[in-house]
Amino acid sequence: YNMSISDVTVPNDLDSLWMPFTDNRSFKKQPRLFSQADGMYYFTPDGRKVLDGTSGLWCVNAGHRRKPIIEAVSKQVEKLDYAPGFQVGHPLSFEFASRLTGMVKEYSHVMFTNSGSESVDTALKIALAYQRNIGQGNRTRFVGRERGYHGVGFGGISVGGISPNRKMFGNMLTGIEHLKHTHNIEHNACVKGQPEWGAHLADD
């Protein structure tokens, strides 16, 4: 893959952007920038090649700059770039939902969201609404696990078990219980199949 460095613009002012999960002051002293991507690699403005080991944020699993994806997105944007989902729809959303439920037989309905964090908060609301709808609105307790990550919405950081994600925000959702985490390198570092250690935590 040949990248033209001359086409890359490096910003000379980094102050306007507030980056999530980042020490912004340190970053702006020594910025780490990606300017292009191809396949499973990112490229820095000076042309260095960096393996994308996390597929973006787990959302570029097919690789970067895949021509079929680019062509499909371009074709759709030229026809219909956006349509709201409140009280109105568009044909492809229903077609896509039908294809998904056809692939995963255990599920009969689909709700599209913009991110994992929104998905988690939506799932929590659905769970509460379901219990209220069947006459058991007193069932409001959620169970999470220490060190568990469920996004960065208020619901997700409430049931999640990463305390630094919560410490600056005061009270979260009430009625949350956190079970002990199962991460133990000493017992589970080199285990084939189901680990022998950890079953006792199910008693929590």
Model regions and ranges:
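Short, well-ordered beta-strand elements within core beta-sheets of diverse protein domains
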Residues: 41, 59-62, 177
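Active-site and channel-lining beta-strand-loop segments
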Residues: 31-52
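Short beta-strand-to-turn element immediately C-terminal to the catalytic PLP-Schiff-base lysine
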Residues: 43, 63, 156-160
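Tryptophan-centric aromatic hotspots in well-structured domains and transmembrane helices
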Residues: 16-18, 58, 141, 149
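Glycine-rich loop-to-alpha-helix module at the N-terminal edge of alpha/beta enzyme cores
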Residues: 6-7, 21, 49-136, 143
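PLP-dependent aspartate aminotransferase-fold enzymes
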Residues: 98-204
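Active-site-adjacent loop/helix segments that line or gate small-molecule/cofactor pockets in enzymes
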Residues: 4-38, 88, 197, 201
